[in-house]
């Protein structure tokens, strides 16, 4: 597990706790941008693309630090506009920090159903075009002066994990409008069944911990790969997952907890 993931997980938990006590001031959003549903067709239909922006530190010539929240509802990360390394960087550079939601997450829904036709626009190509469109056409409602367009305004795209992939790919695909990218733990080379991700844990973790993990995996696999429904159901019940019919869904839920 990467240090970035651990740090961002801790920060997300802290900010989630913070949001239960505090409310992000309305001057930071959320705001909504009219985004094309399909950037690569003649259809002009748009959806409301949600984002937050902190312009407090901005002075003329400052950059925009743009973070696409990736595969979560972005309100979970809205506090990043005031409390994050991005916010610190924006203050240091007299810039703006923006958190934007990924299409099909949170309130940024190009469609109200999950049909195959609707989900055809849920892909990386469209997500990158969303960011490019956002950079090109953005008008910030909480900024009193006009923000010069890119490349006059330097856009720094930020992210970690999948969001980091987007940052790196934006710099590669749209260099004319993206000045720089700061991707962390970004596996930009796609790999099917990327078991190597877990290999450093096996190789460098404490022996007793690795043995315990191996024993648990072996035990659970023995149950899930059997044809005996009773022990499978008992295992799911123990983890509060009795509602999950498919074993791969059960494994995915436990992996992400």
At which residue positions do the language-model features occur?
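Short beta-to-alpha linker loops that shape the active-site pocket of alpha/beta-hydrolase fold enzymes
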Residues: 71, 101-105, 187
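Alpha/beta-hydrolase
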Residues: 169-257
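Alpha/beta-hydrolase active-site loop
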Residues: 118-146
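Catalytic-loop region of hydrolases
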Residues: 1-96, 107, 114, 121
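Gly/Ala-rich beta-loop-alpha elbow adjacent to hydrolase catalytic centers
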Residues: 159-163, 167, 171
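Alpha/beta-hydrolase fold nucleophile elbow
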Residues: 144-162
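Glycine-rich "HGGG/HGxG" loop immediately N-terminal to the catalytic nucleophile
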Residues: 104-117, 136, 192
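Structural recognition of the beta-strand scaffold that forms the well-ordered cores
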Residues: 65-67, 96-100, 156-158, 180-183
